[in-house]
């Protein structure tokens, strides 16, 4: 059964469809693609699995071309973004074109940013193929590429026309990538929904065995939460910042260790544990909450400690470049209970040093 969730942003509202076999559902896509020139952006891993299927689905609507990029966070940069622009220009794509992101978070972020920039904005569609992109990066309009000095530092807020989440894609997802996606799923429970967190604790095996009903529920609940948050705060001036739980520490891990060596979800898991330990040190939560968070990440085979090679100085140099920094102050999203979080801008560096050094 297909679930539909609406992201309510006035004239820029759009639906999210979640279910099975949706990549073959031409009816759902028809209103967004009819008489359009279509460029599918994908990568070398996804193309052999799903490119022909989606090309066949879209062929009746108009001209369909594709560009295939290398696979990996290390390729999410201006050089490979330019490959998308080159493909569009060489084929004389105009403003009535549609870009289709077929892949994980890297492809979605790059395609969305290309759509935002090309001829000052063309339509794009998200078809996320990884769990992480299905529950997080495909929804909400954040688009970006990385810079050697920081993650997602060059980008824009630009909403898709529609998000198509086909759960059958998860059958071909490597176990490590699935676990990385679960880090973002768990994040939603920690920062927003205590009942969902408890449901995750009770359904570890169902999710790890890719039970369809469990997957659809988990993905739908995450998308509901994100749609609610984004509808309240599209450009991250307030409540949307809570979605960055674990990300300030996590982005530091990714940047220091080299993009792609730690998957984004792996870094978020370790970063969320550090955030929970920081919250405990500040008296915001007790040890039992930290323990539940650690146990749930561990149940999905996610890292619960930072890399041994990273010391306080390694973290802090990257955290000072974080996009949430205001007035020179590092701002951290910290849990205040299971199901609640807040943004804190007065976290003593001595507390951070103690947490990082003891991790």
From Swiss-Prot:
Residues holding NAD(+): 71-76, 105-109, 129-130, 142, 151, 169-172
Enzyme Commission identifier(s): 4.2.3.4
Residues at which Zn(2+) binds: 184, 247, 264
Cellular compartments annotated: Cytoplasm
Cofactor note: Binds 1 divalent metal cation per subunit. Can use either Co(2+) or Zn(2+).
Biological pathway: Metabolic intermediate biosynthesis; chorismate biosynthesis; chorismate from D-erythrose 4-phosphate and phosphoenolpyruvate: step 2/7
Keywords from the named record: Amino-acid biosynthesis, Aromatic amino acid biosynthesis, Cobalt, Cytoplasm, Lyase, Metal-binding, NAD, Nucleotide-binding, Zinc
PANTHER family recorded: 3-DEHYDROQUINATE SYNTHASE (PTHR43622), 3-DEHYDROQUINATE SYNTHASE, CHLOROPLASTIC (PTHR43622:SF7)
Family: Belongs to the sugar phosphate cyclases superfamily. Dehydroquinate synthase family.
Protein name: 3-dehydroquinate synthase
